[in-house]
């Protein structure tokens, strides 16, 4: 040890610690095999782990914990007081008793570049990299690269060597990665609500509504508490009356029909197109021609229920829009309202042959419903939804329905519901919204890669995307005739899957009162036992996709899988 060093007796030094000249250490702990550069000061109650390198002219203050394998560049400054002052509020010089240390933790494997300043009461995550000269004001996620003043996340580094990736589990959906990427923005949104006590309604919700309307190319966006509420309120606001029939498909999540029933309407079904899994225009036409009549007043009435048919709800399933030109043409001919269930289709587009342009989901019907369930392409950190419409009267009715029927506080024009989106979720959605277009593009790239790897494989049927569709691949769904065995095989190899959905709605016990039977919707019933959702999320890697396909194809070939033949649908 050099005579130029000041190392107090209370310093704990591990084995093979190397100390350069002109250092000042007191009350701290430095563990095995760590190197301390020249002109470094480390204060009491600071800890430096094993195999760390602390470069020259760095100041590590009281309350800092540095874990193993950390690199600290030259001239890095740590702080431990958010509001440093020389005197107390009474004007007296501060003493140690007046000082409240705010701790900082540098997790293992992190690197901090030269000249960086680390503010107190935060954490630098494992393997994170802080750029030279950065001013770090917030905690840094694991594996993040941050730079600037204030430091912002630029990108992420691999958390583990690629050689281990062949054994790592592949989730069906990764909700951790996107939140890790946006951790600073999401934390800011949450902190804003805490600091302003803005929890229900208010400017944060209004700002998100405006932004989502712009994103969707709609005139109005009304934020509500869930996608189910969004659809229910849209049905009611569009003028569907209790006892009216609303036509939809049986191949969807039950929330679609729940919204119809809870609006006191009656769901009736038409079959799907076998290629897109969405509402078949042919089957809708057959329903309207063969299963409906006009009564004496000219109303369209269902022969099944004897009730007036007033609306159609096409679902943009899995992130792909239904064939809206055909549906809208039929609806116009029969005087029906069209309400889009766009809960899985944020940003999806449809090329309208009628209008000769691409049109976004949520703007072709009289109104549309979106869900912000966490797993959606735009997901909250909880529940949420929105109604989009170009009709200001519908927008006003939805606003009234979501808030106890109020036109203003404590003045109620109707009985409504408690269906508001809270401001915390609105802030989180606002932070995520600018990234949705890029995430959707990444989903399309992942789908194209799956398609490339599986094209020509007879044992597995890949999704079909018509020329008029720009799907956003909320889900990537294939078909195979031994789905349950394949799910078990993929689970055994660490690959997550989903089934959307295993039992069609007309065969669910909840709708036994509708008196549908097996065989009523042959396309839906041929599809549901075979559909299998493979891992799909923007951060899915090419290596992971190759592994998924390898396991899917090899199992399908060995087991003799083959999807059912297409069922021809006609107007007969």
Sequence positions of predicted segments:
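N-terminal "arm"/small-domain region of PLP-dependent enzymes with the aminotransferase-like
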Residues: 162-198, 535
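Short beta-strand-to-turn element immediately C-terminal to the catalytic PLP-Schiff-base lysine
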Residues: 147, 154-156, 371, 385-390, ...
């Amino acid at each position: 040890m050099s005579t130029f060093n000041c190392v107090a007796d209370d310093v704990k030094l591990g084995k093979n610690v190397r100390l350069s000249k002109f250092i000042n250490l007191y009350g701290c702990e430095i563990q095995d095999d760590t190197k301390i550069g020249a002109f470094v000061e480390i204060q009491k109650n600071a800890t430096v782990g094993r195999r760390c390198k602390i470069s020259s002219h760095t100041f590590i203050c009281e309350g800092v914990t540095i874990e193993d394998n950390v690199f600290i560049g030259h001239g890095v400054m740590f702080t431990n007081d958010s509001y440093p002052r020389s005197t107390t509020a009474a004007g007296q010089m501060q003493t140690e008793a007046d000082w409240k240390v705010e701790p900082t933790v540098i997790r293992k494997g992190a690197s901090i570049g030269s000249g960086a300043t680390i503010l107190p009461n935060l954490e630098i995550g494992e393997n994170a990299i802080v750029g030279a000269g950065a001013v770090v004001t917030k905690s840094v996620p694991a594996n993040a690269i941050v730079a600037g003043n204030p430091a912002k996340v630029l990108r992420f580094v691999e958390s583990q060597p690629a050689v281990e990736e062949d054994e790592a589990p592949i989730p069906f959906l990764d909700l951790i990665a996107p939140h890790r990427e946006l951790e600073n923005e999401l934390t800011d949104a949450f902190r804003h609500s805490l600091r302003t006590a803005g929890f229900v309604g208010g400017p944060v919700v209004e700002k998100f509504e405006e932004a989502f309307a712009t994103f969707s190319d709609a005139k109005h966006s009304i934020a509500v508490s869930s996608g189910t509420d969004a659809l229910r309120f849209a049905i009611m606001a569009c003028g569907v009356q209790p006892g009216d029939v609303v036509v939809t498909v049986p191949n969807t999540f039950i929330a679609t029909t729940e919204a119809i029933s809870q609006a006191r309407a009656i769901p009736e079904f038409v079959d799907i197109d076998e290629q897109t899994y969405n509402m078949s225009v042919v089957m809708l036409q057959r329903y309207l021609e063969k299963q409906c009549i006009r009564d004496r007043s000219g109303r369209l009435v269902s022969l099944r229920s004897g009730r007036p048919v007033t609306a159609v709800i096409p679902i943009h399933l899995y992130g792909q829009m239904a064939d809206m030109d055909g549906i809208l043409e039929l609806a116009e001919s029969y005087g029906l309202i069209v309400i889009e269930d766009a809960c899985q289709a944020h940003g999806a587009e449809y090329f309208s042959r009628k209008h000769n342009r691409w049109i976004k989901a949520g703007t072709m019907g009289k109104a549309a419903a979106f869900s912000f369930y966490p797993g959606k392409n735009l997901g909250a950190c909880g529940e949420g939804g929105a109604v989009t419409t170009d009709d200001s009267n519908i927008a006003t009715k939805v606003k009234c329905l979501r808030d106890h029927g109020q036109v203003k506080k404590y003045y109620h024009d109707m009985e409504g519901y408690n269906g508001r989106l809270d401001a915390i979720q609105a802030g989180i959605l606002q932070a995520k919204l600018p990234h949705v277009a890029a995430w959707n593009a990444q989903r399309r790239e992942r789908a194209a890669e799956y398609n490339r790897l599986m094209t020509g494989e007879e044992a597995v049927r890949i999704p079909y995307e018509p020329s008029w569709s720009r799907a956003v691949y909320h889900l990537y769904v294939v078909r195979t005739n031994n789905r349950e065995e394949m799910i078990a095989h993929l689970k055994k190899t660490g690959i997550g899957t989903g089934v959307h959905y295993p039992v069609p709605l007309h065969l669910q016990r909840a709708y036994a009162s509708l008196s549908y039977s097996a065989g009523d919707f042959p396309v839906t019933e041929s599809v549901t036992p075979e559909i299998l959702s493979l891992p799909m999320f923007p951060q899915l890697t090419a290596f992971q996709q190759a592994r998924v396909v390898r396991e899917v194809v090899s199992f399908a070939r060995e087991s003799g899988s083959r999807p059912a033949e297409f069922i021809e649908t006609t107007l007969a």
